[in-house]
Amino acid sequence: GFSARCGREMEEICIMDDATVEVTGGVITYVGPNRGEDRDGYYQRYWHYNARGKCLLPGFVDSHTHFVFGGERAEEFSWRLKGESYMSIMERGGGIVSTVAATRNSNFIQLRGKAEGFLKQMSVMGVTTVEGKSGYGLDKETELLQLRVMRSLNNDEHKRVDIVSTFLGAHAVPQEYVGRTDDYVDFIIREVMPAVVQNRLAEFCDVFCEQGVFSIGQSRRLLTAARDMGLALKLHADEIVPLGGAGLAAELSAVSADH
């Protein structure tokens, strides 16, 4: 048979004529020359698709998205073009803060309809699995609402994309907690995270570990609590300043350190 290609082996292209890809239970079980004619009962056991003249590709996995949110931030694009930094836009009420306000003012139907549109676009581009994050509520009600929207879309019998949900309550410090970041971390751990876990709304917990947002110590405390509650870990790490988020991800055996 054929084993997986790794490293420089992936540069080698193997062309097979009259080839077959067999899939059983959602798992690729054979790739190689067509061997169907020589096997008794082969045609009775499998569905057959003639892909002559076509290209068969694995579905893309988009492992970091924020596709459930309210509002738009198109005007910020021009600000960035003029050289304004991500953090300065956020400090004057733009960025995440702007989207939080719009998301809090959206209901389930509005958020679901918008998110479903994004998923359809992803599907057309070949995405079959997507990780989706909350993080535009920054309060208990809206964080849970975002995650419930994702669960609803994932349970839809007509869905085009599989969804893996991540709780990102520590995406930013909300206006009502400015200057009290430790209190906000306590609120997430004591009030929001248990509800996420009890309702089985997420598989992962993420945190924006960044200067001016959540420190290494605050991120460690939040992620340790998440791990103790049974959530796997992710981090937004070292996006703007090399704070040490990647090292924290390694320390806590996180699944990923993004950005």
What are these regions (language model features)?
Residues 99-115, 120, 128-244:
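Metal-coordinating catalytic core of metallo-dependent amide/deamination hydrolases
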Residues 46-113:
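Metal-associated gating/positioning segment near the N- to mid-region
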Residues 232-233, 241-259:
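Active-site-adjacent C-terminal substructures of enzyme catalytic domains
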Residues 1-42:
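N-terminal metal-binding scaffold of metallo-dependent hydrolase/deaminase domains
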Residues 33-36, 61, 245:
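Residue-level structural signal for beta-strand termini and adjacent loop
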Residues 34-44, 156, 249-251:
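Short loop/helix-cap segments at secondary-structure boundaries that form the rim of catalytic
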Residues 21, 26, 53, 64, ...:
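Divalent metal-coordination and catalytic microenvironments
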Residues 62, 124, 228-230, 251:
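Residues at the C-terminal ends
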